[in-house]
């Protein structure tokens, strides 16, 4: 690291603020995506298609952004992320100003938002990991927990906002939050440590395919995460359908989203202890098991109160997944491939998993309603958990430990 490296306090608190900002803007556009599309007259299948489009755009853009960052380490990651966010603002403004846009225009908007805004998250992770690997103990799990709280607060506020001002008003809030996040990212200290220059000796970044072929344990875990998130993501992306099927309203949806997000906050306080005790791989498996169990409990509910009561299980489900996945990647792939590894994990989980979850949810909702959707999600989650268990049984071999 440079002699003039930024203080730990600034790196830590600034990164926590970035996490809060990201999950606040994420809540404003993604948590209410299905509700907004239904409000604009789209069907469940079309809403599921838009969710799939958003995730597919991330699948394409995340490896491209990660690969570009690996090939051009002299370009600070914050410049790539902030530019991506500003381009997403332009698409979001168009979406807000054109409430009557058709299917194709709507698809294009979600391609841009999914490809540039949501895809910025793994590069934000990498911004912190660069300093963590230099011995700076940035509290990643606390940042993720505060992000969950921000998500929860924005969800409940937007629930009441949608009830009083209309669902379309949430788009304006989203634009303001993205601009604030772009400012936070742009002002984060740039990494000034030793970076590999083109032509220097040392390990070179692999392609995504080469990375998967050379690391079967990592690849099998990705497959399990993909199937697990295919079953878990619809439980939040289509929560509006679950709430209304149990007699709830838009305000109830906001409360449910608040409870879901707030339940992830306690993870920040016990994650490091669990990590030392169990390891990142077992924590990933645990997150798949409890995420699937949430679907089982939702299937057993009969009213909106039951849906609200189930949400705290998120603490051991998706609340564990995000920090555990970051540590698992950092421990499982070579140092030169860690940025790409984070993007590949994001592609398999929120990308492919979210895409297939959207298709699965939209199709089953139109075919047989909420209960059929929940049954399909449970089946996919169980398959994912079994693959994660199989990955843990593979020989660990030589691993790269988190410094």
Regions found by a protein language model. Give the residues of each.
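Cytoplasmic helix-loop-helix junction between adjacent transmembrane helices
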Residues: 111-146
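Structural signature of the two symmetry-related core transmembrane helices
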Residues: 78-93, 282-297
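Hydrophobic core of transmembrane alpha-helices in multi-pass small-molecule transporters
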Residues: 20, 102-121, 226, 306-320
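A membrane-interface helix-boundary motif in multi-pass transporters
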Residues: 160-178, 363-382
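Helix-loop boundary and gating motifs at the non-cytosolic
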Residues: 5-55, 217-256
């Amino acid at each position: 690291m440079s002699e003039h490296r930024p203080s730990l306090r600034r790196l830590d608190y600034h990164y926590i603020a970035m996490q809060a900002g990201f999950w606040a803007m994420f809540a404003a556009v993604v948590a209410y995506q299905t509700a907004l599309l239904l409000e604009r007259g789209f069907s469940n299948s079309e809403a599921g298609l838009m969710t799939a489009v958003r995730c597919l755009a991330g699948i394409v853009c995340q490896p491209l952004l990660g690969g570009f960052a690996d090939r051009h380490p002299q370009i600070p990651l914050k410049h790539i992320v902030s530019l991506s966010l500003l381009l997403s603002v332009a698409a979001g403004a168009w979406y807000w100003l054109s409430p009557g846009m058709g299917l194709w225009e709507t698809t294009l908007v979600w391609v841009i938002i999914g490809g540039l805004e949501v895809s910025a998250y793994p590069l934000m992770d990498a911004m912190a990991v660069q300093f963590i690997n230099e011995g700076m103990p940035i509290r990643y799990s606390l940042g993720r927990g505060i992000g969950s709280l921000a998500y929860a607060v924005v969800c409940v506020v937007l629930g009441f906002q949608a009830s009083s001002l209309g669902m379309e008003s949430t788009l304006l809030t989203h634009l303001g939050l993205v601009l604030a996040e772009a400012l936070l990212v742009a002002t984060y200290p740039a990494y000034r440590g030793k970076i590999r220059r083109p032509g220097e000796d040392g390990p070179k970044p692999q392609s995504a395919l080469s990375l998967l072929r050379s690391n079967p344990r990592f690849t099998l875990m990705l497959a399990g995460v993909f199937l697990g998130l295919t079953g878990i993501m619809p439980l939040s992306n289509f929560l509006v359908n679950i709430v209304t099927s149990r007699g709830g309203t838009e305000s109830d949806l906001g409360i449910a989203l608040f409870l879901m997000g707030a339940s992830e906050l306690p993870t920040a306080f016990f994650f490091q202890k669990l990590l030392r005790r169990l390891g990142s791989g077992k924590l990933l498996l645990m997150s798949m098991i409890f995420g699937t169990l949430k679907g089982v409990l939702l299937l057993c509910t009969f009213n909106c109160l039951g849906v609200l009561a189930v949400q705290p299980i998120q603490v051991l489900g998706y609340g564990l997944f995000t920090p555990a996945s970051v540590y698992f990647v950092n421990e499982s792939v070579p140092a030169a491939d860690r940025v790409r590894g984070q993007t590949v994990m994001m592609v398999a989980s929120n990308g492919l998993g979210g895409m297939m979850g959207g298709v699965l949810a939209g199709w089953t909702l139109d075919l047989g309603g909420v209960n059929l959707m929940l049954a399909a999600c449970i089946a996919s989650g169980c398959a994912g958990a079994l693959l994660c268990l199989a990955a843990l049984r593979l020989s660990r071999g030589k691993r790269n430990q988190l410094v």
